[in-house]
C-alpha cells in the first residue's frame, strides 16, 4: 500500500517537475508612467508605495515560493508541494493582477475603440451603465479584492466580476481591473472607497483596454 502511494505521488509531481526544471525569476515591471502622472486621481505617494513596496513584495514572495516548490517537487514531497499552493496563488495572483493594473491606467486614456464601444453598448446598454455596474460591485467587495471587466471567449460577451484577495480572474480574459485593497487608495481617500472607484474611471487607459479586447477576440 505504501509503495503504491509513493508511486502515485511520484507520478503526480513528475509533470510539475518538468515545468519547474527550466524556470526564471519574476521581476517587478516598470510602470508605463511616472508616479506623479496620475495625480490628482492617485497621488505620487500611493503609486510609489503600491509599486515599490506592495507589488515588489508579491514578486519577491512568488520567487521564494517557487524555489520552495521546486525543492519539494525535486524531492517528491507531494505534501509540501500541496501546502505551498495557497501562497503560490496569492502571490502569483498579486503579481498578475498588478501587472495588468498598471497598464490599465493612463493620464490621458482616450476612449474605447469603436469595436469595444459597440460591444459595451450591446452587452451593457451604454458605457455609463458599464461604469455604474462595475463600480457598484467593486465598491461592494467585502474586505480586499478586485473588480474586473473581462471578455468571455466561450460566450463571446463582456462580463463583470469580482475576485477576493489576490485571486486572478478565471473563465474570462481580463480587460480592466480595479484594485480595492486599501493600500491602493487609503492614504488619499481614507475609508471612502466609492470616491476612489468612481474617480479611477478618469484615468482608465482605454487604448490598453481596447487592445486587450481585440486580442481576446482573436
UniProtKB/Swiss-Prot annotation:
Q: Oxidoreductase as a keyword?
A: yes
The free-text cofactor remark is: Binds 1 Mn(2+) ion per subunit.
Q: Any idea which residues the transit peptide spans?
A: 1-24
Q: In which tissues is it expressed?
A: Expressed in pharynx and rectum. Upon thermal stress, expressed in vulva, body wall muscles and hypodermis.
Binding annotation for Mn(2+): 50, 98, 179, 183
Q: Name one GO molecular function term.
A: superoxide dismutase activity
> Where does it mainly reside?
mitochondrion
Q: Which SUPFAM superfamilies match?
A: Fe,Mn superoxide dismutase (SOD), C-terminal domain, Fe,Mn superoxide dismutase (SOD), N-terminal domain
Recorded GO cellular component terms are: mitochondrion; respiratory chain complex
Q: Which family does it belong to?
A: Belongs to the iron/manganese superoxide dismutase family.
Protein name (database record): Superoxide dismutase [Mn] 2, mitochondrial
Organism encoding this protein: Caenorhabditis elegans
Quote the gene name from the UniProt entry.
sod-3
